[in-house]
């Protein structure tokens, strides 16, 4: 059995998957915020419960935001302060007496989709998350590409390309990102960025679901906004896809529920790619909230 943990600032979610990659059981508990000992106990107790329930010693994979293992073997995860700065992988491997694997949660999302029955035919899969921020991951032949700093797929921290400024106007404001840089594309393409663009052009403060509802009602202002957003997304993806050249692009995060993104993006991409380039197949993520657990569990399928 494959145990996959999706760990965030508020919850520790465990999913147990069988050899056919089907979810058999899941459980969630609150994430301890201050005590590392309590954090380790929470994970180990869930593993013990799963072992007892299924009568096996399952493999353990963990997806967590941040950098799973720094040069000194410790975790960097600002959203999980109880474990940040601690040798999480080594400590859990010792306590559970098994190989524990860690990866960035965005990489786990991409891995989950790459191992979907429908998508395993594609050698190079790019996962793109359009949510609170913009992130993602790359999976080649069923294995995540992490890079030495676990930042492969941090697409949101690429800066706006020149073509974006041509589209939006050269007086378009370069917003400061939480990472400290100016003009990172997640400030414009995330769910919050989607809402910011609307406010910037129309001086109205609406959340993304409200804007999308107006678009669905045929509101001209909302339709113009969505057109602008999709063109900006295509421009930015043109640069990324020219570098990565994936077979499949899977889009997740809150904005993936907006069908116009997956249905209208493909027709806009070719004008931003090399003439010889083939645009990837574009699909909405299949596994929703379970994606993090799935991808973490499947870290043990990558040998």
Swiss-Prot record:
Its EC number is 2.7.1.59. GO terms for biological process: N-acetylglucosamine metabolic process; peptidoglycan turnover. InterPro entries: ATPase_NBD (IPR043129), N-acetyl-D-glucosamine_kinase (IPR023505), ROK (IPR000600), ROK_cs (IPR049874). CDD domains: ASKHA_NBD_ROK_NAGK. GO terms for molecular function: ATP binding; N-acetylglucosamine kinase activity; zinc ion binding. Zn(2+) binds at residues 157, 177, 179, 184. It catalyses: N-acetyl-D-glucosamine + ATP = N-acetyl-D-glucosamine 6-phosphate + ADP + H(+). Pathway: Cell wall biogenesis; peptidoglycan recycling. ATP binds at residues 4-11, 133-140. Keywords: ATP-binding, Carbohydrate metabolism, Kinase, Metal-binding, Nucleotide-binding, Transferase, Zinc. It holds the Pfam family ROK. Catalyzes the phosphorylation of N-acetyl-D-glucosamine (GlcNAc) derived from cell-wall degradation, yielding GlcNAc-6-P. Belongs to the ROK (NagC/XylR) family. NagK subfamily. HAMAP family: GlcNAc_kinase. This is N-acetyl-D-glucosamine kinase.
